[in-house]
């Protein structure tokens, strides 16, 4: 059974406790691979809240941050968000960069990538293929 998380005053279906002010977004500030490289290697890389560029074996790896939204069952519809990193190829990164500030970027065709963040589930999540749907400027892409 999966616990039902709710920030309302209704008791949890699993533990019967009332959970208030629960975090609705969890995630990492960098891709797992960024966290695995040395400080020296990080000097050659770039990390912003939305993009990571990481030199790797004579090439470059490209990552963007996106959101996986999961519905939360409760008295009021809510959403829990995993803020994760996705590795994209150079062509996809160029397409993302071209439209990043475009007010109509949500109309951009979906792209593909691979999950670059491990999530705490029984089965491994790193490397899973995802479809990236860009949204309006200021909003992380939906995966």
State each model region's role.
Residues 5, 56-62, 69-71, 86-88, ...:
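Long, leucine/valine-rich, helix-dominated scaffolding and oligomerization segments
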Residues 12, 35, 83-86, 101:
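Short linear interaction motif-like sites in intrinsically disordered regions of transcription factors
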Residues 31, 85-90:
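Helix N-cap / beta->alpha transition motif
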């Amino acid at each position: 059974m999966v616990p039902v998380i709710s920030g309302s005053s209704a008791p949890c279906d699993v533990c019967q406790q009332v959970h208030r002010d629960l975090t609705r977004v969890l995630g990492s500030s960098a891709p797992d691979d960024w966290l695995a490289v040395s400080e020296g290697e990080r000097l050659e890389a770039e990390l912003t809240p939305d993009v990571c560029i990481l030199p790797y074996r004579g090439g470059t790896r490209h990552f963007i941050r996106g959101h996986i939204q999961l519905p939360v069952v409760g008295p009021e519809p809510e959403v829990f968000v995993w803020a994760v990193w996705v590795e994209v190829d150079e062509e996809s990164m160029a397409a993302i960069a071209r439209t990043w500030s475009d007010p109509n970027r949500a109309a951009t065709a979906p792209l593909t990538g691979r999950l670059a963040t491990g999530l705490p589930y029984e089965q491994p999540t790193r490397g899973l293929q995802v479809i990236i749907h860009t949204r309006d400027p200021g909003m992380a892409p939906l995966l």
